[in-house]
Amino acid sequence: MNINFTPAGENRNFLQEIGRNINDEVLKNKVDPIIGRDNEIRRLIEILSRKSKNNPVLIGEPGVGKTAIVEGFVRRVVSNDVPLNLRDVEIYELSLSGLIAGTKFQGEFEKRINTILKQVKESNGRIILFIDEIHQIVGLGRNSSSGAMDIANILKPMLARGEIKVIGATTLKEYREYIEKDGALERRFQKILINEPSSQEALTIMRGLKTRWELFHNITIFDSALVAAVEMSTRYINERNLPDKAIDLIDEAAAKIKTEMSSEPVAIDSLKREIINLETEYAALKQDKENDNKQSKKEYLEKLKKQLDALKQKRDSLINEWKKEKADFENINKLKKEIEEFQTKLETYQSEGNYESASKILYSDIPRLKKELESAQQKYATSKHDLFKTEVSENEIAEVISQTTGIPLKKLLESEKDKLLHLGDEIKKRVKGQDEAIDAVVNTVIRGRVNINDPNKPIGSFIFLGSTGVGKTELAKSLAEVLFDNEKALIRFDMSEYMEKHSVAKLIGAPPGYIGYEQSGLLTEAVRRKPYSVLLFDEIEKAHPDVTNVLLQVLDDGTLKDSQGRVVNFKNTLIIMTSNLGSNFLLEGKKDLAIQSLKKHFRPEFINRIDEIVFFNVLEKDTVLSIINSLLAQLSKRLNKQNLFFNFDSNLTEFIYKSSFDQQFGARPIKRFIDHSVATLIAKYILQGKIKKGVGYNIAVVKDNITITQNNKS
């Protein structure tokens, strides 16, 4: 049997097939312009102009703009803004996945790569390859069974001789992990370190892209939105880099407005629903034959008909108004796109030396379109347009940040202002007798919410000092529930679980080489998922000193690195640590001695970083009676849900106080006493059938015994 096999692509131009011609994309205006980064582009040009080792590799963190710098260089090539030796060069982005795809037979991959390299070599420097994620060439194409070489080893000789030019891009981590390990490959490339741009540089880059976003999304982007995107992404998104994270915010906010513009306005939608409801009612009444002859039915039907006609008229008017607004706005965007297209043609004609066509565009077409655009914008600005939003402002950016991080950044609504102003009153309903402690915490929260606090530290950090059972943990729970409408916003760590030295690994993750390295730390992961929360470190004095050392960085800078090197942002957390240290002195009213015991236990650098040490008062009798009434009210509320009604006599409150309260143990024994003595008695009566649903009962103390009797009124 004869098998004739011709390798796929024998006479094909693989470079055109699997490469992306960036020059063509720039000419077709498919590539976004780059503003700034002049030093990096100049360094790229200098390396490409060398005789040997003329292969630059751009190294930087993800999102800093490595690929954009290459595209910026290509834009300069297209506009002839480069030295003579680099004019007319073509830059192809090589797809490594396309290179290896379909190479079924041994030697086919090597033939394909050699065909491409031969074409690049024969171009005499007219073709430059760009390989994004260049670290992937190490090992790509190698097959242990056949002994084939990978791309890196195929490229090395040609790179060394300067026969081909390659631009690479990769991250610092992957460069170190793959390319630095191969010394021969590393020395054939010249590194260009791409740093994250400053906030001002990122803002300049975004201002250059603003027009492209506006044309793509058919919206208007205010400059305040660009400033807000840079500032908010810098402050609230720590895991990513500028300008990528700021660009993402603008793009998402613009997409949100675009989606709203594409759908019907809320005003029209609600009118349509109202019309459907009335039409359904009208049809149902008309089909009802029972009351056909009644005058009231006829009058009501006529009233419904008039109401429907008025609503339909209003709907049609709104739809026409909406369509007109939309048409006017689309006309503005159409003119902007035409101006953009003419600008691209102008650049092309100028680079080609076609000055006749360029002058026609520059002095005739563009001025005419700009005049039309100005007229259309004035007309749109003076007309009423309330049906849909067409602008992206800082509010939309804040909304996107809030959705992605859970941090409330939208402008304070009146309802939220009232909530913050009455925050202390709400918490005082739950936590009794600790007004000073509550006020200290609430004032810090208010400062943080209106952005007066230091932006590089947590919202606030406190040590709650007091004897057991005085409300330290309860205050933290109340704060989470009142502030975030959810007690789950409280992230609690019982520090009795962190008494050993190695417990630090539980908080930030195990170090490399240890079991559990791939898993995240409990503290760092919890804050990454819920960046706006209350952190409670209960009984902090029980933790090992090394555990408290981890908190030093959090309290000072508002950040913490986990075991995998990721920086976690604690700047939107409220940190509360509770402690029973010196509680015996606080019972005697000796605060100075309580602080001395705190200073003996914790290091000065730890205490110095805490915003405030909050003392919890010893519970007075009136406060304890108020707590008892509150606990009985909670019990009554639970019973009411089962249609069981109980009234608690005043002598019961006094009896519970005398039987259960002890200054040394605080309020906790009271809850236990109510559960054991009152709730248990009610449960037994229910099981015995002595309690009926819907009937009221009175619980009182008779001769030091708790009794349940039916109310006379029942």
Curated annotation (Swiss-Prot):
Keywords: ATP-binding, Chaperone, Coiled coil, Cytoplasm, Nucleotide-binding, Repeat, Stress response
Single biological process term from Gene Ontology: cellular response to heat
The keyword Ribosomal protein is annotated on this UniProt entry: no
Statement: the UniProt record of this protein carries the keyword Calcium: no
GO MF, any single term: ATP hydrolysis activity
CDD domains xrefs: AAA, RecA-like_ClpB_Hsp104-like
Start and end residues of each stretch annotated as C-terminal: 619-714
GO cellular component: cytoplasm
Region ranges (NBD1): 13-196
SMART domains, sorted: AAA (SM00382), ClpB_D2-small (SM01086)
Entries under Gene3D superfamilies matching the protein: 1.10.8.60, P-loop containing nucleotide triphosphate hydrolases
Residues that bind ATP 2: G466, S467, T468, G469, V470, G471, K472, T473
NBD2: annotated segments: 416-618
Residue span of region Linker: 197-406
InterPro entries: AAA+_ATPase, ATPase_AAA_core, Clp_ATPase_C, ClpA/B, ClpA/B_CS1, ClpA/B_CS2, ClpA/ClpB_AAA_lid, ClpA_ClpB
Function description: Part of a stress-induced multi-chaperone system, it is involved in the recovery of the cell from heat-induced damage, in cooperation with DnaK, DnaJ and GrpE. Acts before DnaK, in the processing of protein aggregates. Protein binding stimulates the ATPase activity; ATP hydrolysis unfolds the denatured protein aggregates, which probably helps expose new hydrophobic binding sites on the surface of ClpB-bound aggregates, contributing to the solubilization and refolding of denatured protein aggregates by DnaK.
Subunit structure, interactors included: Homohexamer. The oligomerization is ATP-dependent.
Written domain comment of the UniProt record: The N-terminal domain probably functions as a substrate-discriminating domain, recruiting aggregated proteins to the ClpB hexamer and/or stabilizing bound proteins. The NBD2 domain is responsible for oligomerization, whereas the NBD1 domain stabilizes the hexamer probably in an ATP-dependent manner. The movement of the coiled-coil domain is essential for ClpB ability to rescue proteins from an aggregated state, probably by pulling apart large aggregated proteins, which are bound between the coiled-coils motifs of adjacent ClpB subunits in the functional hexamer.
Name of the molecule in the record: Chaperone protein ClpB
Organism: Mycoplasma genitalium (strain ATCC 33530 / DSM 19775 / NCTC 10195 / G37) (Mycoplasmoides genitalium)
Gene symbol of the encoding locus: clpB
